[in-house]
């Protein structure tokens, strides 16, 4: 539990899987310490998806200042680098006001960028990305990992099974620059100074977390998630856009096209939400072992 006496110069980083209660925890903390909240969820960045991404309501934003929520049009992309720039600016402004800052979300790469920095890796030519991707497709993950291992052994060991995108990127960076992605990252300074922040991970029991995931989807439908998906579908946006990869979007869009019943869409969305929560749990367990664990 966070003690009020421990807030003087700290930035609070509150992470956790979807439906773990981290947003409510952050809001409660913000009210207790008169703090301001900064979004660290890659989907809550996008406008028009507040319900589907469980973004803060008007009532919640009235209780404490919120930053970087629903600020990007879904037709646009958004990178870790752009978030880091916006987040560090927001944190500086909050601290200039003499307020504690609370960064909350479920996107592990955002937190890693804050605490470890974001490597200034030179651009990788599209041709090399394609070559690395084709090599992965031709050889399969197991053999591709053996190819990557001498180039970047740390990345090969760190990247989870099935994460094709990160494996391919590590290979392409090493081939293009002659320097491993891990080396680029190691040479990078963190955005937050050591000792200036405190990390917390909300870690509810697995069965309880899954039950929360299931219950929240039904509430989202009641609160207008289908209307949000319908509004974006009418825009004819590219399905590859990051915003349209929000958990539940694909399943509800299929229902709106008449391809599935609402019950089928909900069942599929529940399964995808559980898988997403499991991936998040694994990431935070592996990448933030020293952060304090909170059972909500």
Swiss-Prot record:
Family, similarity comment: Belongs to the IPP transferase family.
Name the UniProt record assigns to this protein: tRNA dimethylallyltransferase
NCBIfam families tied to this protein: miaA
The keyword Magnesium is assigned to this record: yes
Site (Interaction with substrate tRNA): 107, 129
Molecular function via GO: ATP binding; tRNA dimethylallyltransferase activity
Record region (Interaction with substrate tRNA): 41-44, 165-169
Residues at which substrate binds: 18-23
Reaction it catalyzes: adenosine(37) in tRNA + dimethylallyl diphosphate = N(6)-dimethylallyladenosine(37) in tRNA + diphosphate
Coiled-coil intervals, chain numbering: none
Name of the gene encoding the protein in the UniProt record: miaA
Assembly information from the UniProt record: Monomer.
UniProt keyword list: ATP-binding, Magnesium, Nucleotide-binding, Transferase, tRNA processing
Positions that bind ATP: 16-23
EC number: 2.5.1.75
Pfam families: IPPT
Protein's job: Catalyzes the transfer of a dimethylallyl group onto the adenine at position 37 in tRNAs that read codons beginning with uridine, leading to the formation of N6-(dimethylallyl)adenosine (i(6)A).
Any one biological process term the GO annotation gives: tRNA modification
Cofactor entry: Mg(2+)
């Amino acid at each position: 539990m966070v003690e009020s006496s421990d807030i003087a110069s700290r930035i609070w980083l509150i992470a956790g899987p979807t439906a773990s209660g981290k947003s409510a925890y952050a809001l409660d903390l913000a009210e207790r310490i008169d703090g301001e909240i900064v979004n660290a969820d890659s989907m809550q960045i996008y406008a028009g998806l507040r319900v589907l991404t469980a973004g803060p309501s008007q009532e919640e934003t009235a209780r404490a200042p919120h930053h970087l929520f629903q600020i990007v049009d879904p037709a646009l992309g958004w990178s870790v680098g752009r978030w880091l720039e916006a987040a560090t600016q927001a944190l500086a402004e909050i601290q200039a006001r003499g307020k504690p800052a609370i960064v909350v979300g479920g996107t592990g790469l955002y937190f890693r960028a804050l605490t470890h920095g974001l490597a200034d890796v030179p651009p990788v030519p599209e041709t090399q990305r394609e070559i690395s991707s084709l090599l992965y497709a031709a050889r399969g993950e197991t053999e591709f990992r053996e190819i990557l291992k001498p180039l970047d052994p740390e990345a090969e060991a760190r990247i989870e099974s099935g994460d094709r995108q990160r494996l391919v990127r590590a290979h392409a960076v090493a081939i293009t620059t002659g320097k491993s992605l891990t080396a680029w990252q190691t040479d990078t300074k963190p955005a937050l100074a050591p000792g200036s922040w405190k990390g917390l991970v909300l870690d509810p029991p697995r069965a309880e977390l899954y039950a929360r995931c299931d219950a929240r989807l039904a509430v989202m439908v009641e609160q207008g998630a289908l209307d949000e998906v319908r509004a974006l579908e009418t825009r004819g946006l590219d399905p590859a856009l990051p915003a349209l990869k929000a958990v539940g979007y694909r399943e509800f869009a299929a229902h709106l096209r008449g391809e599935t019943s609402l019950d089928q869409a909900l069942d599929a969305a529940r399964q995808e939400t559980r898988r997403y929560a499991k991936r998040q749990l694994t990431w935070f367990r592996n990448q933030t072992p020293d952060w304090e664990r909170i059972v909500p």
